[in-house]
């Protein structure tokens, strides 16, 4: 590209770890990212929208499937817009299953995603840190995860004076290896 005008980073996890609710990396960081207001770059400035308020269906290649993706803030936006001066819009999208979103909604409704201290039995705890302690360890999920992930970039811009659009992606096959006998 001579100029990049739009960038959509799309992170789809089509894997299934068999747990009712778990995060694929640090639960405290994951839940804070998902529930935080969304920031995306548009026309020279960051714009803010409510968490999870923008979503769309996305059809991944190579039979990964169609997933609902949600626009959210991810820190790489900061450096990308700084180092790509021609960029007009930059967004980060991530997929979440309806099951994940329902569990997250219930946890928010009962206060378990709070980051301010509460007193329980005379001890101050932070609900989100307590939740992290009782959720499955993300490091253990690989043993039971099956499916595919697809992460990629949809990029538009100009090359040699002509409009150009590409989707560059990577597919990862997740599987559980058989137990040694």
Model-flagged regions — what are they?
Residues 2-177, 181:
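C-terminal catalytic/substrate-binding lobe primarily of soluble NAD(P)-dependent oxidoreductases
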């Amino acid at each position: 590209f001579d100029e990049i005008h739009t960038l959509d980073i799309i992170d789809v996890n089509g894997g299934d770890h068999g747990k009712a609710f778990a995060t694929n990396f640090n639960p405290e960081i994951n839940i804070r990212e998902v529930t935080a207001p969304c920031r995306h770059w548009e026309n020279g400035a960051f714009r803010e929208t409510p968490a999870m308020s923008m979503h769309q269906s996305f059809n991944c290649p190579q039979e990964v499937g169609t997933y609902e993706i949600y626009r959210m803030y991810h820190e790489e936006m900061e450096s990308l817009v700084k180092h790509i001066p021609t960029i007009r819009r930059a967004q980060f999208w991530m997929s979440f299953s309806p099951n994940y979103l329902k569990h997250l909604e219930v946890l928010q409704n009962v206060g378990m995603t709070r980051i301010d201290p509460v007193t329980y039995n005379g001890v101050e705890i932070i609900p989100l840190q307590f939740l992290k302690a009782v959720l499955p360890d993300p490091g253990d999920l690989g043993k039971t995860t099956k499916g595919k992930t697809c992460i990629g970039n949809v990029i538009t811009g100009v090359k040699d004076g002509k409009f150009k659009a590409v989707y560059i992606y990577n597919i990862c096959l997740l599987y559980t290896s058989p137990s040694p006998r």
